[in-house]
C-alpha cells in the first residue's frame, strides 16, 4: 500500500516505514505530523475520490528537524568588466519517517 501526499509544497510517494525529506516544517523532533492525501493505491484498488480521500491521512514522525540539503553555488560573471559574484544556498529540510496510512 502506498500513497501520494502533499508535503512541504511538493507531492511525495510514501509507504509505511519510508523516510523522506521535505521543506522545513514547524515541528520538533519526535512530534507527529499529518498530511493530506492526493491518491492511495492498495494492491489493485486505487482511491482518488475526494470524499474517500478526506477520510484517509498519512501520519509521520519527525526524525530530524534540522536537516540541510546540498550546497548550491551560484556564479555570475560579466565579460570584460571585472564583475564577478559568487553566492551559495543550502535549503533547510525536515526528515520524516512515515508511521501510518489510515
Curated annotation (Swiss-Prot):
Keywords: Ribonucleoprotein, Ribosomal protein, RNA-binding, rRNA-binding. This protein binds to 23S rRNA in the presence of protein L20. Part of the 50S ribosomal subunit. Contacts protein L20. InterPro entries: bL21-like, bL21-like_sf, Ribosomal_bL21, Ribosomal_bL21_CS. Pfam families: Ribosomal_L21p. HAMAP family: Ribosomal_bL21 (MF_01363). It comes from the Bacteria. GO terms for biological process: translation. One of its GO terms (molecular function) is structural constituent of ribosome. One of its GO terms (cellular component) is cytoplasm. Belongs to the bacterial ribosomal protein bL21 family. This is Large ribosomal subunit protein bL21. The keyword rRNA-binding applies.
